[in-house]
From Swiss-Prot:
Protein name: Adenosine deaminase domain-containing protein 1
Disordered: annotated span: 183-203
Gene3D superfamilies cross-referenced by the UniProt entry: 3.30.160.20
Keywords (A to Z) from UniProt: Developmental protein, Differentiation, Nucleus, RNA-binding, Spermatogenesis
Gene: adad1
GO cellular-component term (any): cytoplasm
Presence of the UniProt keyword RNA-binding in the record: yes
Species assigned in the record: Xenopus laevis (African clawed frog)
Positions of the DRBM domain: 98-166
InterPro entries, A to Z: A_deamin, ADAD1_DSRM, dsRBD_dom
GO molecular function (one): double-stranded RNA adenosine deaminase activity
Domain of life: Eukaryota
Length: 586
């Protein structure tokens, strides 16, 4: 291990095994001593580097009872792992630590055996590329590639450490993930498990436990949606596009807090009253329903009633006026289909950026605009769409949430960024999440974290596939309909995505104008109510929707950095909606 080599370089004292070998008499004249490599390794690992040492001559003529009672030091894997420090996590997330150094430090803290070994490149990558993978306690992790060995090793170390950090001590994460948003679950099984070591068995057990939890979450979502539409069977087939947010409390309790369905977006002429719902894709609808849930939780906290305040998911944080999620809370996003856009790209195409299909791969990974159910590269459009309102693809929005959080600009005035811990796909036709991982994780480098404002980071959610809550269907009867629900709602609201307003037969209707409870005007109304209840006197009254969003300075800064990053990396420009749609007031 690297720690052994480092110790040897900084100390001139010979190891116990070296002294033993030098001082033992010839085997023919004295009893033989059985030496093991384990003894040398463990002595080096446990001996402190104090700069001085007392060397005692060893004869090797030990009495038989001494040899029979000689204790072999334990292997590294049997030593008690130390907790990973908050300082280490912060430095690694911000890019202050070299990935190789960070991996070896992590291995030392967790008492793991580690090796970086050279392997073969993945995919049809042409050219002089080197490939390495990390082997940790006998488990082989994903392959890292580079134009030189140093780069390949660094990429391999980073891939391994990113997975290893997913199964940190839950107690550590519960107390510290408010600033790091580290996932408390164990990592997925590495691609190529080696051997049948005890560590492999433990990893499989932990992963099986997480799979069981995700399957349980899927069944809870199915039950919740079925109950919501039980009185309205005509909307049951809308569940084929279902998306939902679930909050995990204490690792043992799960609550469905937001649901959305839909596959279309509004593409008609511009309206500036804030009462039209522009994007009705399931994931986006579920997220806007989640915002309504957050507003309810803020009102609980600001109610002044101790019983209601205790029920809120938010709590105050020292040294900041921004609220944070309470400890032991995790957020899961379930989707019955892969989101439209780059996530549906062939993963083999993405893994071969230097092949003949490189242009096609870049085109697939670029930002996309959703137009009438189809996704078109954003590079085909100008920086702002004036006449018709189109939306960015669901995959691009999900990627953005992994940097900015799911809370949006208005809520960022009250709370810290809220990140998704796990993404669960229930699509029976989806065999792996590789395409989604490439689109969401690999398009943005961790190094961006160091440039982001405080509390913002590049989040890395865990992804898995579970049983689908509802089978997909090609029924066109309700193709443009979108359902939404948030915890606390008495019934679902049904929106016609083509016109961006509630249908006449919807179980819930907010008024005669048929504006959805998810529209911008409704969100601004809730924002004004929270401003009043929180007694934020510094926030002026009568702000327009656009003016209120501009008050979230750090959020807007992070948003600008991310948009610039997309453009610099060749993914295209984020298409902005005309400012006029946010100039309404309440």
């Amino acid at each position: 291990m690297a720690s052994n080599r480092n110790w040897s370089q900084h100390s001139s004292v010979p190891s116990f095994a070296q002294m033993l070998k030098k001082n033992l008499p010839d085997p023919g004249t004295s009893p033989a001593v059985n030496q093991t490599s384990t003894l040398s390794t463990c002595c080096l690992y446990n001996q402190p580097d104090c700069g001085t040492a007392r060397v005692t001559r060893i004869t090797g003529n030990f009495p038989e009872p001494f040899l029979s009672k000689m204790i072999v030091p334990p292997s590294l894997s049997s030593l008690t792992p130390r907790k990973v420090t908050k300082e280490f996590m912060v430095k690694y997330r911000r890019g202050d630590l070299n990935p190789i150094s960070a991996l070896y430090q992590f291995a030392q803290m967790q008492r793991m055996e580690i090796e970086l070994k050279e392997t073969v490149t993945t995919g049809n990558v042409f050219g002089a590329y080197f490939a390495f993978c990390a082997v940790v306690d006998g488990l082989e992790y994903k392959t890292g590639m580079g134009q030189n060995k140093k780069e390949a090793k660094a990429n391999a170390a980073k891939l391994a450490l990113d997975e290893l950090l997913l199964h940190e001590d839950p107690a550590l994460i519960d107390s510290e993930n408010q600033s790091l948003n580290v996932i408390e679950n164990p990592p997925p099984l590495p691609m190529n498990p080696r051997g049948t070591t005890e560590t492999s068995t433990i990893s499989r057990t932990r992963t099986d436990k997480r799979t069981f939890i995700h399957e349980k979450i899927s069944s809870i979502i199915k039950e919740t949606f079925t109950n919501l539409v039980s009185k309205y069977p005509e909307y049951e087939n809308c569940g084929s596009s279902l998306a939902a947010f679930v909050i995990e409390k204490g690792g043992q309790h799960w609550e469905v807090v937001a649901i959305g369905t839909g596959e279309f977006n509004y593409g008609q002429s511009l309206q500036s009253d804030g009462r039209v719902l522009h994007d009705s894709h399931a994931m986006v609808v579920a997220r806007r329903s989640l915002l309504r849930y957050f507003y309810r939780q803020l009102l609980l906290l600001y109610s002044g009633n101790n019983g209601m305040m205790d029920k809120s998911i938010f709590c105050t944080e020292p040294a900041t006026n921004l609220l944070a999620l309470k400890p032991n809370l995790n957020i899961f996003l379930y989707m019955n289909q892969l989101p439209k856009g780059a996530a549906q790209t062939n993963p083999q195409l993405c893994l071969s950026p230097h092949s003949l299909s490189a242009h096609e791969a870049n085109d697939k990974l670029s930002l996309h605009v959703s137009v009438e159910g189809k996704n078109i590269p954003a590079s085909y459009y100008s920086g702002e769409i004036v006449h018709n309102l189109y939306s960015m693809s669901s995959t691009d929005k999900l990627t953005r949430w992994e940097v900015l959080g799911v809370q949006g600009a208005l809520l960022s005035i009250f709370i810290q960024p809220v990140y998704i811990n796990s993404i669960i796909i229930g699509n029976a036709a989806c065999s792996d999440t590789r395409g989604l991982e490439i689109a969401v994780k690999q398009r943005i480098d961790d190094a961006l974290t160091s440039r982001l404002p405080m509390f913002y980071l590049v989040n890395r959610p865990y992804m898995s596939i579970v049983s689908s809550t509802h089978l997909t269907n090609n029924d066109t009867a309700n193709k443009t309909l979108s359902l939404n629900w948030s915890q606390g709602d008495a019934c679902v609201e049904v929106v016609d995505a083509a016109i961006g307003r509630t249908v006449e037969g919807s179980p819930f209707k907010s008024g005669s104008c048929l504006a959805s409870r998810l529209c911008k005007a409704a969100m601004l109304c809730r924002f004004n109510l929270v401003v009043k209840e929180s007694k934020r006197n510094a926030i002026p009254s009568g702000l327009s929707y656009h003016e209120a969003k501009r008050l979230a300075g750090p959020y807007q800064e992070a948003k600008c950095l991310l948009n610039s990053y997309f453009k610099q990396q060749g993914f295209g420009s984020w298409i902005a909606k005309p400012p006029i749609i946010g100039e309404f007031t309440m």
